[in-house]
Regions:
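Short alpha-helical "recognition helix" segments of helix-turn-helix
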Residues: 20-21, 50
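Recognition helix of helix-turn-helix/homeodomain-like DNA-binding domains
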Residues: 26-40
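Residues in the helix-turn-helix
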Residues: 19, 30, 60
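A short, Lys/Arg-rich alpha-helix, primarily the initiator
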Residues: 1-16
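Short, charged recognition helix plus adjacent turn
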Residues: 8, 33, 62-67
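Residues within the alpha-helical elements of helix-turn-helix
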Residues: 12, 23, 53
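DNA major-groove recognition helix of helix-turn-helix/homeodomain DNA-binding modules
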Residues: 45-60
Length: 67
């Protein structure tokens, strides 16, 4: 199972969903799904914009656990 750790990364950096929306140009509603880990299909464009804005690697946002 793949889970997003966006909430943890954002909390650690002190970035809100609203601020991330401003930094990335991605709609708040879309980021909210990533933040709450309810997104079904990951968009590479969205992940790239998030990584760029938060100055992090994709591995910082995704966690793989065996289910």
């Amino acid at each position: 199972m793949i889970t997003l750790t966006l909430k943890e990364v954002m909390d650690k950096q002190g970035v809100t969903r609203y601020r991330l929306s401003q930094l990335t140009g991605i709609q708040y509603a879309i980021l909210d799904k990533y933040y709450k880990n309810t997104v079904i299909r990951y968009d590479s464009y969205v992940l790239d914009r998030i990584c760029t804005a938060l100055n992090c690697d994709i591995a910082d946002l995704l966690k793989h656990t065996k289910s």
